[in-house]
UniProtKB/Swiss-Prot annotation:
PTM-bearing positions, type Phosphoserine: S22, S23
Protein name as it appears in the record: Myosin regulatory light chain 2, atrial isoform
GO cellular component, one term: myosin complex
Note: This chain binds calcium.
Binding site for Ca(2+): D45, N47, D49, D56
Quaternary structure note: Myosin is a hexamer of 2 heavy chains and 4 light chains.
Annotated InterPro entries: EF-hand-dom_pair, EF_Hand_1_Ca_BS, EF_hand_dom, Myosin_RLC
Modified residues (N-acetylalanine): A2
SMART domains (UniProt xref): EFh
Gene of this entry: Myl7
Amino acid sequence: MASRKAGTRGKAAATKQAQRGSSNVFSMFEQAQIQEFKEAFSCIDQNRDGIICKSDLKETYSQLGRVSVPEEELDAMLQEGKGPINFTVFLTLFGEKLNGTDPEEAILSAFRMFDPSGQGVVNKEEFKQLLMTQADKFSPAEVEQLFALTPMDLAGNIDYKSLCYIITHGDEKEE
């Protein structure tokens, strides 16, 4: 009987600790940020079951143009959640990753996902398509307004390193 009680108390304490940990993650972000994370989670959760699984990741990568992602890479991503990745776990993982992260490096990392060759540029037309079809869909006018301020290389690709500098430091470069 005593051992059953201790086991029950241990479960209750673990549940309380998990609730406390998950409630803290929501206080790390503003409501608008949480909504953006929710939209990102919904984009990744392809089968809409509330849990990100390997097939969700494969489909998301496929939509981003990366068809053959190594199984080990997908497994490593899923293992970061130490269990099923629901929205709270997803938010916690981002909270851990972004805590103390340089905003410029975070933006560069996001762009690198669209630059598998590591050239420092992303294809303008592919990026335009993503902006108009994923998450907070941009209108054609909004995309053109964005691209008017976006540095391009001679081939018409987006120079995302320069764009990142503009986003984090403003339009004027230091002399």
